[in-house]
Amino acid sequence: MSVAHGFASSRSALLACTLLFAAPASGNAQDRSVVLVPHRAVYDLALGQTRENAQIVGVRGRILYDFDGNACDGYTLQFRQVSELDSGEGKISTSDLRSTTWEGGDAKRFKFTSQNFLDRNLVDSVDGHAEHGSAATAVDLAKPEHKVLDIDAAAVYPTQHMVRVIEAARAGKTILDFPVYDGSDTGDKVYDTLTVIGRKLGPDDRKHDDAAAKAPKLAGVSRWPVTISYFEKSKAQKSTEQTPVYAIGFELYDNGISRALSLDYNDFVVTGKLTSLEIKDIKPCR
């Protein structure tokens, strides 16, 4: 698989890191329930660093992340990541990942569809849904081919995963591990995740000139540095030496907004700067 194909076909970890959450203004921070806030965010991508054997010399791109919904109707996410990858000597490939998901507010049901394009050619397409049961989670795939399978009942969907990360950060925990299912790749994989949460940052720590810094609603809101590593569950079970498929780093606000992204694909790292942020009104439950 080429670097460009691998970059395009990996479901960006942003699906698990940039959901926006908010909490009521009253009560102790650790006792507040996590309430999701609809938002639209744009991140500009660039090559952060390369490591030995890296096959690219430049990355330029953008992520569009549009999240909506509430705990009653469920949560929808429209996601698109377009990236130009320069492998040197004038060889530039364009990857385009498009994804739409819906997750039930009760964290039991999950629907997903995605398409990966490389140089405008469709590389693969995934479509399916999953539902938690008492003994297992049932997955029904329509694409890339019809398949019905059961996955670990302990696996959580992306939104619920981030709820637990925020709850852990509020409680002062530094390590969190959960299996996560997001329907990515061929739709039949569960990823083990390891989340490392740093100390809470103050208002003057790690200042950034980005859209978050210019958002009045974020003034005085606590945030934490977070790194989430993703491991293929089947490979992790076979080997004690686990190397993540990818890892993401970001600053996570108490209300769920993420900034200062770092997408680590092992041989190269892509950074994401939050350049546009629109926080939408929360739709009340009917």
Q: What residue ranges belong to the model's regions?
A:
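Bacterial N-terminal signal peptides that target proteins for export
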Residues: S2-L14
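Bacterial N-terminal signal peptides
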Residues: S12-A23
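A short, structured loop/turn motif at beta-sheet edges
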Residues: D31-V37, D66-Y75, W102-K108, L218-G220, ...
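Hydrophobic residues positioned within well-ordered beta-strands of beta-sheet architectures
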Residues: A41-Y43, G61-I63, L77-F79, L97-S99, ...
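Hydrophobic/aromatic-rich structural module bridging two neighboring secondary-structure elements via a short loop
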Residues: F79-E131
